[in-house]
From Swiss-Prot:
It is found in: Nucleus inner membrane. This is Probable C-mannosyltransferase DPY19L2. Probable C-mannosyltransferase that mediates C-mannosylation of tryptophan residues on target proteins. Residues 1-58 are annotated as: Disordered. The keyword Transmembrane applies. It has been suggested that DPY19L2P1 is an inactive pseudogene from which DPY19L2 has evolved by duplication. However, expressed transcript sequences derived from the DPY19L2P1 locus are known to exist. Changing Q309K: In SPGF9; uncertain significance. It is linked to Spermatogenic failure 9: An infertility disorder caused by spermatogenesis defects. The most prominent feature is the malformation of the acrosome, which can be totally absent in most severe cases. Additional features are an abnormal nuclear shape and abnormal arrangement of the mitochondria of the spermatozoon. It comes from Homo sapiens (Human). The chain crosses the membrane at residues 108-128, 195-215, 242-262, 263-283, 297-317, 344-364, 372-392, 423-443, 489-509, 534-554. Residues 129-194, 318-343, 393-422, 510-533 are perinuclear space. The keyword Ligase does not apply. Its EC number is 2.4.1.-.
Length: 758
């Protein structure tokens, strides 16, 4: 957006300088006439010798000429102020036209951004409704659609809004005894629940205002379901908690698309670049996001703020002003990105890992880079405070990299005094940064006692080193944590996204290598030249990092695909392809690319729109109804993590394990609970469950036999973890045949079996 304004300003100013030059030429003649007049009037020009006495006719002619000259001089002095006023008015008129053009450009950019934001919001709402028929589901069915950790997060939103007051609800989730019974935990600190707290406050405020004025907030009706399902009541409108909750999420992600447009427009220098970013996102929508299928996940709240943060960082890298506001905005967007999601710190670490080599070779001036590091440090500190001293923020690779970067910046001059070559100077700084970051990370983890917590970096390390144990297999056997599908690059190619980005990356890489080679050859820093393209180098490095992450963990495509869409906007950049646009019409090139993109892109959109379904899960509904009406409110349950989240959400019964698997203590509990799918003895498992105060165990027959891929059935995972019992029969099969004497079957349907722990 801002880039567009700058370019229009340049065009206007160049026109102004030309007209000003023309006015300058006309005005330049007037002092010459004036000077000539003054010379003649004062007798500055000498007559030939012997001609001092002139004839009367000559004197008269001289008088007439002198009178004419005096008249011209008088007119010049009289017209001078008017000419000045006229020139000033012309300049003012041009300035107004320039401001109007910039305002028009800004308004156009903002208008398009609002339009694409609304378009994306409608797209998300349509896909979500088509998939589940959410508007016609009962409250219980809507809660069941939030499976696994989604149900866990939504349960805290439900707790707050159903409490007598907002503050009481806040106190309840900060002193939660239901989730890891009998432990009392601060759920905000453990599960990053600021989104639920904020949305709950909005919901309570909205309902309070609507009730004050007596306005209806929802419409309810009875829905007749297929036999043997009974009739249920379904409500639609912002007064329904589930509708309000997902509505806020879709609005936020709709706004994200408007931000993508402005991001692409600013990076490429043209609004057409922003449109290419948006179209690429829509054409590759299934590869770019999953918010329409899984709204409550942490990434749905967090990722839009990463887009904002990267847009602000691009502005900082491109401009050379000392304005503090972009740096403050960078700090706040970092906080907004980190608070909702535990994996956000690792993504910010990849940013620092991309920025540091740019600083080393001279793409970023030290003072600017130092400010960026300080803002990141402040954002970590603020997040640590707001998350009630969550030590994960201080023991991450991100925090360690910030400290090492700060130390290297301070010691830079001392390293230079070693008198090494430029290349060795770079290698020393890079080696010190990597080694120092890794060592500092492990030291802080040990000191703060969080070395046993699983992070995204641990999963990536397990992938690279091919290390497996019970905990890593629980993660990596899930489809979203598998390697990238082989068909994904083909899908990128069909929409022309991959070829376009590869061409852009090659041009940036070629220019970067040429610049760095020249720096090494001349042994000087090309700060002015390199600073102009630092944002391009940064985006290229981030693209490489996101590509590596997406290949290792499929779920991280959510970072790669949108970033590729932003990079695709650079096909409109005259900075990169000005040589091409001077030979071929700019519009023809872009129109041709968009035409080819839209062939497969439109087919992808039609495939998404064709997904029509209606949610129902009768076995789980029967289970939840039985628990709600056939057990006491203090009965404690254990079982598969996804099912436990649903039990807590819909029945409010205590559970001992849940899907938020990063915490070391929780993983130890889950390991005990999942031992029913091992080859251990029934007595040993029963005794361990009693230590956790479990009253009922929910056994799922599918978990006894399901195998997502080789080595990923629960029995195979346990054989890796517990080889000493590999010869014993599976406990799950024993319990399905006859659970006595250590367990008693009290409920059973086609999927679930509830065992009372004796």
């Amino acid at each position: 957006m801002r880039k567009q304004g700058v370019s229009s300003k340049r065009l206007q100013s160049s026109g102004r300088s030309q007209s000003k030059g023309r006015r300058g030429a006309s005005l330049a003649r007037e002092p010459e006439v004036e000077e000539e007049m003054e010379k003649s009037a004062l007798g500055g020009g000498k007559l030939p010798r012997g001609s001092w006495r002139s004839s009367p006719g000559r004197i008269q002619s001289l008088k007439e000429r002198k009178g004419l000259e005096l008249e011209v001089v008088a007119k010049t002095f009289l017209l001078g102020p008017f000419q000045f006023v006229r020139n000033s008015l012309a300049q003012l008129r041009e300035k107004v036209q320039e401001l109007q053009a910039r305002r028009f450009s800004s308004r156009t950019t903002l208008g398009i951004a609002v339009f694409v934001a609304i378009l994306h919001w409608l797209h998300l709402v349509t896909l979500f409704e088509n998939d589940r028929h959410f508007s016609h589901l009962s409250s219980l069915e809507r809660e069941m659609t939030f499976r696994t950790e989604m149900g866990l997060y939504y349960s805290y939103f439900k707790t707050i809004i159903e409490a007598p007051s907002f503050l009481e609800g806040l106190w309840m989730i900060m002193n939660d005894r239901l989730t890891e019974y009998p432990l009392i935990i601060n759920a905000i600190k453990r599960f990053h629940l600021y989104p639920e707290v904020i949305i709950a406050s909005w919901y309570c405020t909205f309902m309070g205002i609507m009730n004050l004025f007596g306005l209806e907030t929802k419409t309810c009706w009875n829905v007749t379901r297929i036999e043997p399902l009974n009739e249920v009541q379904s409500c639609e409108g912002l007064g329904d908690p589930a509708c309000f909750y997902v509505g806020v999420i879709f609005i936020l992600n709709g706004l994200m698309m408007g931000l993508f447009f402005m991001y692409g427009a600013y990076l490429s220098g043209t609004q057409l670049g922003g449109l290419i970013t948006v179209l690429c996102f829509f054409f590759n929508h299934g590869e770019a996001t999953r918010v329409m299928w899984t709204p409550p996940l942490r990434e749905s709240f967090s990722y839009p703020f990463l887009v904002l943060q990267m847009c602000i960082l691009t502005l900082i890298l491109r401009t050379s002003s000392n304005d503090r506001r972009p740096f403050i905005a960078l700090c706040l967007s970092n906080v907004a990105f980190m608070l909702p999601w535990q994996f956000a710190q690792f993504i910010l670490f990849t940013q620092i890992a991309s920025l540091f080599p740019m600083y080393v070779v001279g793409y970023i001036e030290p003072s600017k880079f130092q400010k960026i590091i300080y803002m990141n440090m402040i954002s970590v500190t603020l997040s640590f405070i707001l998350m009630f001293g969550n030590s994960m923020y201080l023991s991450s690779y991100y925090s360690s990299s910030l400290l090492m970067t700060w130390a290297i910046i301070l010691k830079r001059n001392e390293i230079q005094k070693l008198g090494v070559s430029k290349l060795n100077f770079w290698l020393i700084q890079g080696s010190a940064w990597w080694c120092g970051t890794i060592i500092l990370k492990f030291l802080t983890s040990k000191i703060l006692g969080v070395s046993d917590h699983i992070r995204l970096s641990d999963l990536i390390a397990a992938r690279i080193l091919r290390y497996t144990d019970f905990d890593t297999l629980i993660y990596t056997c899930a489809p979203e944590f598998d390697f990238m599908e082989k068909a994904t690059p083909l899908r990128y190619t069909k929409t022309l996204l991959l070829p376009v980005v590869m061409v852009i990356t090659c041009f940036i890489f070629k220019k970067t290598v040429r610049d760095i080679s020249y720096v090494l050859a001349t042994n000087i820093y090309l700060r002015k030249q390199l600073l102009e393209h630092s944002e391009l180098a940064f985006h290229t490095l981030q693209l490489l990092v996101f590509t590596a992450l997406a290949i290792l963990i499929m779920r991280l495509k959510m970072f790669l695909t949108p970033h590729m869409c932003v990079m695709a906007s650079l096909i409109c950049s005259r900075q990169l392809f000005g040589w091409l646009f001077r030979r071929v019409r700019f519009e023809k090139v872009i129109f041709g690319i968009l035409t080819v993109m839209s062939i497969q892109g439109y087919a992808n959109l039609r495939n998404q729109w064709s997904i029509i379904g209606e949610f129902n899960n009768l076995p789980q509904e029967e289970l939840l109804q039985w628990i709600k009406y056939s057990t006491t409110s203090d009965a404690v349950f254990a079982g598969a993590m996804p099912t436990m989240a649903s039990i807590k959400l819909s029945t409010l019964h205590p559970i001992v394990n849940h899907p938020h698997y990063e915490d070391a203590d929780l993983r130890a509990r889950t390991k005990i609970v999942y031992s029913t799918y091992s080859r251990k003895s029934a007595k040993e498992v029963r005794d361990k469950l009693l230590e956790l105060h479990v009253n009922y165990y929910v056994l799922e027959e599918a978990w006894c036999v399901v195998r997502t891929k080789p080595g990923c059935s629960m029995l195979e995972i346990w054989d890796v973890e517990d080889p000493s019992n590999a010869a014993n029969p599976p406990l799950c099969s024993v319990l399905l045949e006859d659970a006595r004497p250590y367990f008693t079957t009290v409920f059973q349907n086609s999927v679930y079996r509830v065992l009372k722990v004796n």
